[in-house]
Amino acid sequence: MKKFYYILAIGLLMFGMNFQAKSQTRKYVSNFSHFQSYFNPGLTGYEGSAVRGFVRNQWSGIEGAPRSYFVSAELDFGELSGEMDPALMGKNALSVNMLQDTYGAFRETELIVSYASRVRLTEKHNLRLGAGVSYQNIRLDGNALTSEDLNDPTLGQYLGGFSDMQVVDFNIGLALTHSKYYLSYGMHRVGGGAIISGDEFIDSYPASSIIQGGYREALSPNVALIFNAYYRTQKDVNDNFELNLKTLLMDRFWLGVGTRVNNATNLQMGILTKRLRIGYLFEFPVGGDYNLPGNTHEFTAVFNLFRDNTRRTDNEVLIW
């Protein structure tokens, strides 16, 4: 009986993945606070100039489960010009982001180039505005189609072959930032996938809205608390609401816990060196649509190009 439920769960997983692929897949990133500029171009350069990356193996142990690779580079022109406090005094930043996501018969490669500009509102507040151009190439492997795919009149015609689809669109975002907190709103695919070339095997490409916010506080010289929240809504999939809480100890390592409401819980840890921070996250299902066998592993790395991971003031917190 257990074997029967296991096989049934895998079948439901593959069906759910393929159903979403015909419209637009959702890419989960549980360490979302380390990759703010990918979700909102207005937050480009918020943590200074850095190279970032992650590897995410979702539902490990299940064939065809999502697997994601990400790398980005952010450049804050305020740091280049030698500003004493570039996060506050700087005005412009640029980023290049690349994400590759594999799920079942689909492999998606996304490239985003973003630019952000800042307007100083008060002594400690900035209003950040950003825009980005995204290019996506989605490749369909007809040799990896499932039985559900073959019953679909659009996907079934690609059995045994390969097909590619390209989409060009735009992202926008704005954010209110402070050294201790931020609140932002971003939108991906503003044009709704209006610029498409190649074979159109995805039947809809709706825009998605993303709200992010966070607060951090140094409780003592050796302890800091960091809280982040993330909400994403899109027409053809369920809303996604995530929360993360971390404790940074001695400015050298952190421990945390997070949740994707009604879906999954995660445990996280990481270390900071002079310029580098490395994190690991273990996620397990707790209910909802994806309460299926298999857990998720996520590895992250951030390398500061110009700034060391040391406090400039007593109440500064080094990570989000």
Predicted features by range, described:
Residues 24-320:
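Subset of outer-membrane beta-barrel
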Residues 1-8:
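Bacterial N-terminal signal peptides that target proteins for export
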Residues 8-16:
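Bacterial N-terminal signal peptides
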Residues 17-23:
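Sec/Tat signal peptide C-region and signal peptidase I cleavage site
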